């Protein structure tokens, strides 16, 4: 019999927002879209030119499968990771792996920790947070998942004391989507010490580290090598690094040899590697166009300041000051449009329907991104939030 074999209600928050947005457009509304975190416009010209040259190359390797290596772009993964770090990683202590972006490997991490054969407890930063790690955990029948506590009270940084006994894998995401919080060297050091002492594998999704606006922002890779017993890995991507590289699907992992070896085994059975010409373009920009990358970072920082000031003037309350990326996170008003607000979803859907402002509701919070030109949208945004007449308490 034909029909879905999946349980009902499996769509995540992004699917809900896209559906509501589509319905509003169908009604003829003009939208002020601050929802999905995808940069506008093209990738950096330096990346596009290098990718174009690679596509036109006669080198057979540039047009072939790359698998878990990158023969067309020699030493890509080490070079890509190293360009994100303040100092080189110790030779012989780590291994590298090219990836087609971070999202495709999130579901492989529990498998690399043995969840196909035995029970594994996985902790994630998904409440609030990017939902895909939790979504993948739900697909793995031997995984027990829990979300680490993240809120304004702990500044969206969990503590080692929050980690449940028998946890086998922790999947962190710093800088954090959606709060914009960063991890510091000292914070990572305390977490690494705990994981090493309790035999917990540790992974960090560092997708937004290239857009850090705070000098304290650190990568796991800066600290983890201090702990020889720690099994760890970290992933980086070109998606937001080179302007709009979201469709390029290029990145790299680094980590302890044991964890990367397990990831190579699992990943090697699920894909044939990234698209080499796009990798050639990404590494050319990363190594040769830091000015262009810095310009995008400065643009987002300027837009963050503009949007937070505008929304605060309209009565909205920040959950935390963003220190990286291009997101702002807000406390949900208890009143708007002359009535009580039941939830973040209620407020977001009502804002879309009443004003055309599109955000993303994450649990008790609301996320508004600055990928769009918020300066051009500012008058309309201010009018929309003033129309809402938000209140708290």
Named regions from a protein language model:
Residues 283, 298-308, 318-335, 362-365:
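Conserved glycine-rich beta-strand-loop-beta hairpin in the small C-terminal domain of fold type I
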Residues 89-90, 228, 340-341, 349-393:
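PLP-dependent enzyme catalytic core of the Aspartate aminotransferase-like
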Residues 31, 144-145, 202, 318, ...:
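Hydrophobic beta-strand scaffold residues
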Residues 2-3, 7-101, 288, 391-393:
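N-terminal small-domain helix-loop-helix segment of the aminotransferase-like
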Residues 24-27, 140, 197-198, 314, ...:
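Helix C-cap/helix->beta junction micro-motif
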Residues 62-195, 209-227, 233-234:
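Conserved core of the PLP fold type I
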Residues 17, 34, 51, 80, ...:
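Generic structural signal for small/hydrophobic residues in well-ordered secondary structure
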Residues 51, 225-301, 305-311:
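Conserved core segment of the aminotransferase class I/II
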């Amino acid at each position: 019999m034909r029909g879905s074999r999946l349980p009902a209600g499996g769509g995540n928050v992004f699917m809900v927002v896209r559906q509501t947005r589509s319905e509003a457009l169908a009604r003829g509304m003009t939208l002020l879209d601050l929802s999905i975190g995808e940069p506008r416009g093209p990738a950096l010209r330096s990346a596009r030119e290098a990718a174009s040259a690679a596509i036109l190359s006669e080198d057979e390797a540039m047009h072939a499968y790359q698998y878990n290596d990158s023969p067309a772009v020699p030493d890509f993964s080490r070079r890509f990771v190293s360009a994100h770090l303040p100092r080189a990683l110790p030779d012989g202590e780590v291994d590298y792996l090219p990836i087609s972006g971070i999202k495709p490997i999130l579901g492989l991490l529990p498998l690399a920790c043995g969840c196909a054969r035995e029970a594994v407890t996985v902790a994630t930063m998904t409440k609030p947070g990017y939902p895909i790690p939790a979504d993948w955990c739900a697909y793995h029948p031997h995984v027990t998942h829990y979300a680490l506590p993240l809120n304004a009270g702990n500044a969206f940084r969990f503590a080692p004391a929050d980690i449940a006994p028998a946890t086998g894998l922790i999947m962190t995401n710093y800088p954090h989507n959606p709060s914009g919080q960063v991890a510091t060297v000292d914070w990572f050091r305390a977490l690494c010490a705990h994981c090493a002492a309790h035999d917990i594998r540790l992974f960090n999704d560092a997708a937004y580290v290239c857009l850090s606006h705070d000098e304290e922002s650190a990568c796991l890779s800066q600290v983890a090598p201090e702990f020889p017993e720690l099994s760890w890995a970290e992933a980086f991507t070109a998606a937001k690094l080179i302007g709009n590289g979201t469709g390029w699907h290029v990145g790299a992992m680094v980590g302890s040899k044991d964890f990367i070896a397990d990831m190579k085994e699992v990943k090697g059975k699920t894909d044939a590697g990234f698209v080499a010409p796009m990798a050639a373009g990404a590494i050319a920009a990363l190594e040769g166009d830091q000015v262009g990358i810095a310009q995008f970072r400065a643009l987002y920082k300027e837009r963050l300041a503009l949007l937070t000031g505008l929304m605060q003037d309209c009565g909205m309350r920040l959950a935390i000051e963003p220190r990286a990326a291009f997101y702002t996170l807000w406390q949900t008003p208890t009143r708007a449009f002359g009535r009580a607000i039941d939830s973040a979803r209620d407020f977001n859907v009502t804002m879309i329907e009443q004003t055309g402002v599109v955000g993303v509701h994450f649990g008790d919070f609301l996320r508004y991104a600055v990928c769009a030109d918020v300066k051009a949208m500012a008058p309309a945004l201010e009018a929309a939030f003033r129309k809402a007449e938000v209140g708290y308490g």
